[in-house]
């Protein structure tokens, strides 16, 4: 349903809408090629994010010191970057994974929605995402 809405919104752009839809989805309708492209992009996005993090770490840790937080002109009082910020980053990542593990392994349904267990009816739009009546012309 979301892909259909995106397709309809993109196709409403004058002159270039159809070209944008075909570029994004591979066609106007949501079919197997669309789903393959969607899954491929969502598979690649975490790796892109990890690459950006590594580029950030290389750029930040490659310098001699911090960004001079005290505003001192000389290098004598500058803080070394690696011992403080790397440890802080590692502690933060460790705490994040502990909290994530608690939710995943001990409370898997804590952040879920009870409607996830309702059998789906493909012929009916779920009530939670039915658009307001005044938006219907844009989705048609």
Swiss-Prot record:
Which Gene Ontology MF annotations are present? metal ion binding; ubiquinol-cytochrome-c reductase activity
Q: Which Gene3D superfamilies match?
A: Cytochrome Bc1 Complex, Chain C
GO terms under cellular component: mitochondrial inner membrane
Residue ranges of the TM segments: 38-58, 85-105
Q: How is the cofactor bound?
A: Binds 2 heme b groups non-covalently.
Matching entries from Pfam families are given as: Cytochrom_B_C, Cytochrome_B
Q: Where in the cell is it found?
A: Mitochondrion inner membrane
Task: Tell me where it mainly resides.
Answer: mitochondrion
Cleavable signal peptide: none
Q: Where does heme b b562 bind?
A: 42
Membrane topology designation:
Multi-pass membrane protein
Cofactor(s) named in the record: heme b
Annotated keywords: Electron transport, Heme, Iron, Membrane, Metal-binding, Mitochondrion, Mitochondrion inner membrane, Respiratory chain, Transmembrane, Transmembrane helix, Transport, Ubiquinone
Q: Which residues bind a ubiquinone?
A: 61
Instruction: Name the family.
Output: Belongs to the cytochrome b family.
The function of this protein is: Component of the ubiquinol-cytochrome c reductase complex (complex III or cytochrome b-c1 complex) that is part of the mitochondrial respiratory chain. The b-c1 complex mediates electron transfer from ubiquinol to cytochrome c. Contributes to the generation of a proton gradient across the mitochondrial membrane that is then used for ATP synthesis.
Question: Beyond the main fields, what else does the record say?
Answer: Heme 1 (or BL or b562) is low-potential and absorbs at about 562 nm, and heme 2 (or BH or b566) is high-potential and absorbs at about 566 nm.
Quaternary structure and partners: Fungal cytochrome b-c1 complex contains 10 subunits; 3 respiratory subunits, 2 core proteins and 5 low-molecular weight proteins. Cytochrome b-c1 complex is a homodimer.
**Protein name, entry field:** Cytochrome b
Q: Which organism is this protein's natural source?
A: Aspergillus terreus
Question: Species lineage, top-down?
Answer: Eukaryota, Fungi, Dikarya, Ascomycota, Pezizomycotina
Question: What is the primary gene name for this protein?
Answer: cob
């Amino acid at each position: 349903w979301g892909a259909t809405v995106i397709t309809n919104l993109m196709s409403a752009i004058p002159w270039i809408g159809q070209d944008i839809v075909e570029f994004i989805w591979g066609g106007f309708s949501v079919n197997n090629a669309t789903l393959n492209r969607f899954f491929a992009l969502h598979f690649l996005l975490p790796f892109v994010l990890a690459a950006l993090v590594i580029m950030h770490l290389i750029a930040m840790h490659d310098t001699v010191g911090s960004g001079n937080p005290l505003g001192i002109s000389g290098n004598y009082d500058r803080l070394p970057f690696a011992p403080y910020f790397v440890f802080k980053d590692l502690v933060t990542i460790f705490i994040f994974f502990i909290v994530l593990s608690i939710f995943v392994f001990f409370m898997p349904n804590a952040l879920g929605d009870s409607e996830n267990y309702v059998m789906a009816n493909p012929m009916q739009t779920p009530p939670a995402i039915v658009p307001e009546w005044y938006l219907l012309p844009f989705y048609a």
